[in-house]
């Protein structure tokens, strides 16, 4: 019988095991996966790792911790070359940091060749240096983009909206969302036109990202000049703040859980949310609005974009079982496996899986996710983005608490971010 271990929140055990000797010659190879805990990977680890084991005879071990705990352990493993893990599960934001520091193996050198069925926006996130856009200081402008990471589970922010409130057609504009909110919100009965993640740092930045880009703004211009205090960005934040009267009290402290639960309990008409919440909307044990929520790409102002946020994976540069790790990547990224993954309720990263009729019937949100992935925009591809995001997200949170003064808060964020970037070697202007 094939055996697989799940060691949740026990990363120390994995490190100790890696240092404790090699075992006997007859012992099967065991791939050690390191990941942060998230329901988005449950189908993979619960259903597809056992299938991989059965198909290949390679055992797997899934080591899991909270988001920040796993990030620190993975960084330590990469820096020390301890070899405690074969495969890292990463937020797509981590790819520039891990690849740039040499913590990931070059997948091209290991023989991985992506086929044309990959969604371009998904596979491109695994390249370093990035295929498009700015390159951070120290990265040769002539360096060829190289594949260091692959998509593992697709994720993107889409608009969840109440069909019983908006009607058969999705809101055509952001003004439509605000108009319906102003007409139909009833805070006394806990009926709100909008809900958002407003907590400082990454949560509020994720919420603001789509509006920033939809209104024609961007984080950076030429030579990493900070532009998130441009007139377009100020207009976007002013609109974001104009929704506050139609939101629950305390949204400046909301993270994803509070945002999603407000929608599932029937208290909000719309929100931009990650796709991991899709299945829950139709689960009677979790949702009071079963079959009342539909999904689409957020509406257009000047642009129409969605925020990418994929689960990515890569082979650790110090992995003891690189060949078997690549065997897993080749297996899981096969189109037939991705189709089965989509039919099981996973969010795939291959076009054929998104277009599979059985998968589309079982998961009615796949069409919206595919459209959103097609127009998706990632966070800026620099290992220093997390610091800039924290700066901007802190000032966005202050704007929510202040309920106004959009330009002042964005100017303050821009000044602080510019100072940081210049200290880190960016031209920033």
Predicted feature residues:
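Short, solvent-exposed loop/beta-turn-alpha elements that line the ligand-binding surface or hinge
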Residues: 109-120, 195-199, 215-236, 283-288, ...
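Conserved N-terminal structural module of periplasmic/extracytoplasmic solute-binding proteins
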Residues: 2-103, 252, 300-303, 323-324, ...
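Long, aromatic- and glycine/proline-rich binding clefts that accommodate carbohydrate-like moieties
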Residues: 28, 121, 125, 291-296, ...
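Periplasmic-binding protein-like
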Residues: 43-44, 187, 331-351
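Extracytoplasmic/periplasmic solute-binding protein
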Residues: 136-152, 157, 176-226, 232, ...
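Glycine-centered hinge/linker elements that transmit conformational signals in sensory
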Residues: 180-185, 222-253, 294, 298
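Hinge/lid segment of periplasmic solute-binding proteins
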Residues: 92-156, 176, 290-296, 358-362
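A bilobed periplasmic-binding-protein/Venus flytrap-type ligand-binding module shared by bacterial periplasmic
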Residues: 160-164, 308-322
